[in-house]
């Protein structure tokens, strides 16, 4: 199967108080198109930093990152932003909804950035899929945590991304709401045929993916393929 994400010899080093802090150390892996991958590990293991590098939110100190055929290493910030807008969707632990926009307007943002047509109708269709059509004109402060994450899901899938990155998507939700969000995430992902990369502490969420990469101290310590039906 063709790889949509290739990580080769990637390291990330920060300068702190005159010393070097190695957050990622010579990371190597590829992600097959259409697959689902979980990246797990304790806090400070480097998994969120790795996710940011994979998405082009930051530059690696060394190594090569290729996303959907585009090598990110030498691109400017504006060029990386254009790649993200074209190929990538995001789901965040803290939802990251714009507080001055309604649920509908939040979902419309990526579509507007791409200059898509029939923006409002498409955004409403996605809100309907996540069960929030009747809350489309509510602002984030008027929505529960679970509802905000459902808006975030609709927004993430709005531009039909080739690759979706989810950083602790259930981290701020209770167990019952988390299960609903997980089911919705995988249902939407299956319908869209999107490649899904999740950073999570939740072993049940990780077990639902095709593959689990475990990290510790900036290193990959295991690369597993859990069974999930």
Give names to the regions the model predicted:
Residues 219-229:
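Conserved beta-strand-loop-alpha-helix hinge in the C-terminal portion
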Residues 1-2, 229:
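Short, Lys/Arg-enriched, disordered terminal segments
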Residues 2-215:
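ABC family nucleotide-binding domain
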């Amino acid at each position: 199967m063709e790889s949509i994400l290739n990580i080769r010899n990637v390291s990330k080093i920060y300068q702190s108080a005159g010393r070097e802090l190695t957050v990622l150390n010579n990371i190597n892996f590829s992600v097959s198109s259409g697959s689902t991958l979980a990246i797990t590990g304790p806090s400070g293991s480097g998994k969120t930093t790795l996710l940011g590098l994979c998405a082009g939110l930051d530059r690696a100190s060394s190594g090569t990152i290729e996303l959907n055929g585009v090598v990110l290493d030498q691109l400017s910030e504006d060029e990386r932003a254009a790649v993200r807008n074209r190929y990538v969707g995001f789901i965040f632990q803290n939802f990251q909804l714009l507080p001055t926009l309604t649920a509908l307007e939040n979902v419309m943002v990526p579509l507007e950035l791409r200059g898509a047509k029939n923006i409002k109708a498409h955004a409403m269709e996605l809100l309907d899929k996540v069960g929030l059509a009747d809350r489309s004109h509510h602002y984030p402060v008027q929505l529960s945590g679970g509802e905000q994450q459902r808006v975030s899901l609709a927004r993430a899938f709005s531009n039909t991304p080739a690759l979706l990155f989810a950083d602790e998507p259930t981290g701020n939700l209770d167990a019952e709401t988390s299960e609903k969000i997980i089911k919705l995430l995988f249902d939407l992902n299956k319908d869209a045929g999107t490649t899904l990369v999740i950073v999570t502490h939740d072993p049940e969420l990780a077990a639902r993916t095709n593959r689990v990469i475990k990290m510790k101290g900036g290193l990959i310590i295991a690369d597993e393929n859990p069974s999930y039906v």
